[in-house]
């Protein structure tokens, strides 16, 4: 994993290419990412994905984007972000990036590329049916990947079959009548110098499927108690992932409340 340079609130830091910005901030000792809108209470990283309620930042590099969870930004060289308290600023320059759309008909659509989704894709692909499997994470595997555990190579290889379309960094945003799904694929935000001029930044997928398999998994929620938004309070799944996958320790001493294995991991 190569080291890249990024800027946060005007200060230059270093991190590992491809890791979430939240992991890089924690590795550099940044506990307070932003402040609340009205009372200016300090807030840090709580989660790992779109469930992140506190660590919202503004991207100033590239096409620019406001109100993005730091947990969903892949680190690339030259990334420029700043903390965000309240409403973000829309970019005032013209967005020169390309955006496109595509329409697909498929036998089976699988939403979620965790262990369950991968096994479903393998079984359906072996039957000869056409498959689209999409997932909003940076890589397949779900919780198994989060804990840096190995995934059976046969499952990964099943995604390479001719009748399988595999889409990572793709979020299904709507499920409508007659098995019609709309999804957004983020195609270039995780790239830097490798971007081709004709490559679109995002692609909207309009998918009609004969069958849909929901393998979306679940995410944790913060317990309700006073001051539960203070820096240092984190979901056990997030803390375990930062430690095992990104080698970032989130605390030395602490209290762990858990109802599953993540608290012990």
Give a label for each model feature.
Residues 1-265:
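Residues forming the flavin
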């Amino acid at each position: 994993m190569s080291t890249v340079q990024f800027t946060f609130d005007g200060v230059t830091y270093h991190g590992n290419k491809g890791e979430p910005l939240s992991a890089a901030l924690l590795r550099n000792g940044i506990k307070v990412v932003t402040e609340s809108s009205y009372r200016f209470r300090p807030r840090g990283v709580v989660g790992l994905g779109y469930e992140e309620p506190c660590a919202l930042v503004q991207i100033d590099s590239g096409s620019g984007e406001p109100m993005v969870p730091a947990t969903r930004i892949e680190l690339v060289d030259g990334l420029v972000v700043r903390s965000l308290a309240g409403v973000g600023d829309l970019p005032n320059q013209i967005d020169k990036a390309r955006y496109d759309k595509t329409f697909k008909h498929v036998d089976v659509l699988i939403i979620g590329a965790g262990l369950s989704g991968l096994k479903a894709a393998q079984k359906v692909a072996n039957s000869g049916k056409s498959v689209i499997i999409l997932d909003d994470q940076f890589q397949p595997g779900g919780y198994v990947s989060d804990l840096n555990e190995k995934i059976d190579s046969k499952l990964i290889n099943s995604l390479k079959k001719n009748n399988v379309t595999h889409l990572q960094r793709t979020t299904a945003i709507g499920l409508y009548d007659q098995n019609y799904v709309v999804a957004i694929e983020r195609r270039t935000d995780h790239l830097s110098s490798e971007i081709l001029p004709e490559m679109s930044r995002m692609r909207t997928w309009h998918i009609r499927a004969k069958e849909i398999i929901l393998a979306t998994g679940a995410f944790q929620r913060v317990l309700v108690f006073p001051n539960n938004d203070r820096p240092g309070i984190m979901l056990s799944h997030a803390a375990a992932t930062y430690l095992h996958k990104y080698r970032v320790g989130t605390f030395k001493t602490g209290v762990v409340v858990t109802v599953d294995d993540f608290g012990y991991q």
